[in-house]
Amino acid sequence: MPLNRRKFLSKSAATGAGVALAGAVAAPAAQAAPAASATAGQKPENPGKRYSLTVMGTTDLHGHVFNWDYFKDGEYSDAAGNAQGLARVSTLIDQVRKEKGRENTLLLDAGDTIQGTPLTYYYAKVDPITAKRGPVHPMAKAMNAIGYDAVALGNHEFNYGIETLRKFEEQCDFPLLGANAVDHKTQKPAFPPYFMKKFHAPGAAPVTVAVLGLTNPGIAIWDKAYVQGKLDFPGLEEQAAKWVPKLRSMGADVVIVSAHSGTSGTSSYGDQLPYVEDAAANIARQVPGIDAILVGHAHKEIAELKVVNDKTGKTVVLSEPLCYAERLSLFDIELVFVKGQWEVESVSASLRNANTVADDPKITKLLSDQHAEVVKYVNQVVGQATVTLTTVDARYKDAPIIDLINKVQEDVVKAALAGTQYAALPVVSQASPFSRTSEIPAGKVTIRDLSSLYVYDNTLVAKLMTGAQLRAYLEYSAEYFVQTAAGATVDVNKLTNAGGRPDYNYDYVSGLQYDIDIAQPAGSRIKNLTFNGAALDDAQEFVMAVNNYRANGGGAFPHVASAKELWAESTEIRTRIAEWVTAKGVLDPKDFASLDWKLTRNGTPVF
């Protein structure tokens, strides 16, 4: 479904801004050129005329509209004193507009908008926006009310499928940009690649600003089930090199890139794709003609990063606001009118903190009913727990709460394969310690408790693996631990995340027994690997229950992405856990806990 241009252009006209918008497949970029040529056709005024533009940016909102923790059922708080949510950042945005003059500001986002909280899950799956006479997505409501100008697509926009994304797009009063999200057959943009807007400069030609939106190539892996054969996601660098010159030729005085891509120049998916995952700094270095880049995806806080372009020697300014609307990036751009055209004289970036202001009552009132509906949903009781289960030490000790995930996955896969040629094969399962703070308290168990355990909307896949492949899989997973010599002090805060690997890329594997010797170098850590009490047979076949992220190559674990797929489903693993607990009625570790692995040093247990 293309962008609703009538609604978008009507909004632009109401603010007095002329807009050239390219990118819907039906409208080639060349058609937008006449709209931009008006700048060149105006009579130049006095050289030295100046104009100040402020571009505001958020990123990785992940469905956070209020400063509320749905998993804790209360106001969000952390040790750093952060505050979250669009209602909070809306107040910051209003402050900036009053300071700078709304007519001199632009508001952007760098993606990952419609996934990440029970709120976004609810309006994708429980009361879906795609239903006949379905609701308006709360993120669309909030961002429309705040007045976003353009938003880049994030990879999590595709988590619920293209139909949900297109419906969200239809509900937005702003374009969803993705120059490198192209139709598989035609290789033409499937979403608007860019957005252009003119700003009135008294006594001089208008200032034309172009925003190029770029999403993440990893979507081809992470949401393969939804996009394969429909959409392709080429590299950010090559697409920026294609589009930035076009935008300049169309009269853009300022070019901003909104990129759902970090700055590290690395990829979590290894060499599975020829495109870099975190390529924002690469774009700045390699592609001439960019003034600033709003960075997303990495969930890092970068007030200002200056990168020198290799070809022009000019400095490009990058900024990444902290996720969940905890920060607002500001790019202050100074222009001077010289020889009949606007030139960027300077760009600086800074951050504003959402914890310095109160919620915007306009947004609170707008979304209070939808928020209340979700709070009611997540507090439904589904069972009783005999003891408290927690992930506090699940990174370095085999924790029953993670065993619960694996037990559910094993049971679902066994039932799915019953009566097939694979029914007799042993089933093993992988699960990761997603959260360090998840807790299922003794007593009543709610959907909220289980959602805090499994925070992602992953689904279940069954893969055919050999013993040798599982051994390699475990060795790769064990690289998560920092090598620690026997006798050295063990600091659990420094024991994990070696090489920057996140917790979600460390896997337990149930059904096998093994030691991880952290005194050994990476690649030689798995010891005493057994199955049913005997040494693992490298040739034996297993069914491995994995989440779809891992099955598609997420985390670059060996063999699993290329392994034969035996079965898959669209029901979320979180839902399967809730169903399992509901059916049991009682959550008792004796029904799922098993000691499968432990950390050792030269054979001696660490704990």
Question: How would you describe each model-predicted region?
Answer:
Residues 206-208, 390, 513, 535:
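Short, solvent-exposed loop/turn motifs
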Residues 22-29:
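C-terminal segment of classical bacterial N-terminal signal peptides
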Residues 286-287, 388, 412, 416:
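Alpha-helical structural context
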Residues 380-398:
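Glycine-rich phosphate/diphosphate-binding loops and the adjacent beta-loop-alpha structural elements
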Residues 358-362, 384-385:
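Acidic, Ser/Thr/Pro-rich beta/coil linker or hinge segments at domain junctions
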Residues 46-54, 64, 77, 84, ...:
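Feature captures C-terminal
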Residues 213-225, 347-351, 368, 372, ...:
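N-terminal accessory/precursor segments of enzymes
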Residues 3, 7-18, 33-356, 401-408, ...:
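Acidic, metal/ion-coordinating pockets
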